[in-house]
Amino acid sequence: MRGGGRFSIIIFALIGLAIYYFSNQEVNPFTGEREFNTVSIEKATQLGAQSYAQMLQQEGGNVVCSRAAGTCSAAGRELVATVREIGERLRIAAIDYERELLEAGWSFEPVSHKFDWTFNVIDSEQPNAFCLPGGYVAIYTGILDVTGNSDGQVTLADIKDVDKLAVVMGHEIGHAMAHHGAKRMSNTQLAQFGSMAVAVGLGDMSVSQQNMVRQAFGMAAQGGLMAFSRDHETQADKIGLELLVRACYDPREAPELWERMGQLGGGQRPPEWMSTHPASETRAANFREWMPAAVAMYKARCEQLN
């Protein structure tokens, strides 16, 4: 194909991508910004349910107090009950938060009341937690020492003070409320379409030139996706804080939690711009910035803080 014809195809492809991008925008009520999304709530929830079922099957006996586990100790029952109690309070808070946004004039489709809220605990040293689209939540026991007394071992003492665990769970639920999983899939798909458009224009180039262009586009796309991911993490932190206060958990525990998270792995991590998550120090600083408003709301809704 001649260069002019190939160039025209690239231009039309880029115009098509731009039209596709701007015609699939929705307002994020938690930020007020328009964001790209092509995956419906129903589709995302279906995928979330499938992924969650696969995860539970893979974990098998590691799912605390499940049928696959066979037995359920008193400690296991207390742990699962605590997680589910926190989850129920955050579920109610999520519904209330969306209702308040609608009453404030935001136009969006609330999702929290539609979710199939499910909370399970996974016996694993991995310090992790997640909430898939549809409200499917998993808490790994490895996170409990970070949210608990931070003494290097996981015991029931780690769930006596539930506020930091509520911070983690509120953050993960915030991802689901803001459709971050769907938006991540949408942006990945957009990057793939862009890669296809770039590939059309490589035919007349040498192999070395093609490799350079592919590498440059790949780095740019990856950098863009990482930036989206960091932004989503910050959004989920803010939404989680809103849920935390509405559920009457102490918001002041959040900064210390992220300081502890920053110490995992000896504090070694890549630069923030090369990561999908903001630095723990950045997150702790964000929470301190948001804290006066959160404390004021807590006092108005709940009780006086010590």
Task: Annotate each language-model stretch with its function.
Residues 237, 250, 255-306:
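Extracytoplasmic and endomembrane cell-envelope/extracellular-matrix remodeling and assembly machinery
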Residues 160, 174, 178-227:
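Short, low-complexity, glycine-enriched hydrophobic/amphipathic alpha-helices that associate
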Residues 160, 164, 185, 189, ...:
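Alpha-helix N-cap and coil->helix boundary residues
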Residues 1-11:
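N-terminal Sec-pathway targeting helices
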Residues 2, 14, 19-189, 202, ...:
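Peri-catalytic and regulatory segments of divalent metal-dependent proteins
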